[in-house]
Amino acid sequence: MRFGIFINSCVCALVMSVAIAPSAVALRQAQGPSGSLVTPLSIDSAPLVTEPVEESASLPTTVTEPVEGPASLPVTVTEPVEVASSPQLHSTNKARSKTKAQRYVESISRSESLKSSVLGVLALTEGGDTLASWNSGQRMVPASTMKLITTGLAIHRLGPDFKYVTRIGYSGSIKDGILDGDLYIVGGGDPTIASKDSIAIPRAKLFAQWKSFLDKAGIKKINGKVIGDGRYFDGPIEHDTWSYQDIGTAYGAGGNGLCFYENAQDFRVSAGPSVGSPVNVTVSFPNTPWMRYEYPCRTAPAGTGDQLYLFNSEFLPYAEIRGSFAIDRKPKTEEFSNKFGAYTCAHYFCEYLKSNGVPVSEGPADIRLGRVRSNLSSNEYAPYASRVDDLNMLGQTYSPSLKRIARETNLKSDNFYAETLFRTLGRRFHHSASYDSSYVAVNEVMKNIGVSADDVRIVDGSGLARHNYISPSFFVRFLSAMMDSPSFADYIQTIGQPGNRHYESRLKDAPATVKSRVHLKSGSMNGVRCFSGYIEPSTGSKSDTIIFSIMTNNSLAPASRIDPLIDRIITLLAADN
């Protein structure tokens, strides 16, 4: 948004383009047509420092930036910038009364570490004071800071005490202790089943609960299958914009209605005896005897690192581990993805039943395209699976609470949990867990908290996609809106703090009095480093809470050079409050 201020004198006309920072409240409330901000114009004696902003394609655009000149006369230089045809919340330039944080942001924008990079910053108090701003309306790739949005919407809409439900049911009939039919594990989206996460119910305990339902029903033998039913989530298990290399990793596993071990699989790998020899690879857990694996990966020269990638698909039980593993690397456990979570869950519960005196005549199966599939290598399908509503339910178990799942999502930056939350919103509020439906549901929940997402693009819940485009100003107004949510006290507890678990190295030079007031979430991928969050006020006044978003994109510098710059911004912001 640009306001032209014309100051006429008898000597000359000076034209200045000024973009004024919207407050945290104005970012949410003062919106005009097409999501543009309507901000009251004010002029004071503070120096004007401006930066590039996007404009409507129909308008001529100029940018003013400071140059050296006489102290008594502000001097500006105008130059053309590219314009955008789509409306967006436009970047505030600098705070009208410069803070230390603002001055530091301006200085690092010209640093070698951020050379030819995109830097976006916005920090406001909830009361409306702008503490730092730079390219705040620039849409950028958020990486894992996207999880702040996903967890916030889930906690707000589903409630912090929401729990996923997994049900055990059967088709057919029970007579003389024999189930003449199939046993169903009906997934409800619980992402923690058999997870190694500390919040998850241990697998043996969970399976014992499931078996107790059979015991109460008098089932001692199953003449049929144990079917893993993941139909609660429809559609592909990963987003179609994810990198093919990513979807083979554990962090790109993707979620479904019934999962197992976060749909991950561990492999033990070690270098071969010489450069060029095969890498030694063995499946660790879970064991998937129906899978066929090939390992066309080779031992590489010392210093080349770990370049192993698994390529797999949910359509066929075949996978390859390609790439290389340096000869000087120590043996390690690689975490890759398992595209058959529901089948794996059925397999392991089937084995549990057999080892505890309940034979299963036809073994495990899952459901694909509505049909029972017992042999993943065959194109042959059994008849259609029973409808869930037609099953006889024996019992149900519950996941940990949503606030605990959301906390692990943000602290561990768990993509699997984040995607599950994202798709749960679609399933619960738009009748489908497909990514398209989930996106619609997310937009609806966003409007419910008073935030428009018209000026950003959201395609997944974890931030793994490079097709997410979020601006610092959007993060700030979203985080500001969350402060008014009845679930905010639970939400802020999901966000990490410097010095605590997973953030031990953040703000390491800052005093403890500063660290204890900062809540932040990081996001990183190649060329991307972002941090967003809150700084609690030393005054204890809600209006003094600082909401910040600091984003860098297209950087060639390593995180070890970018992070200290971001840490310094956050420390200076906290010092001002």
Could you describe each region identified by the protein language model?
Residues 89-110, 156-453, 542, 575-576:
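Conserved serine DD-peptidase/penicillin-binding transpeptidase domain
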Residues 135-140, 335, 462-465:
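A short glycine/serine-rich beta->alpha loop
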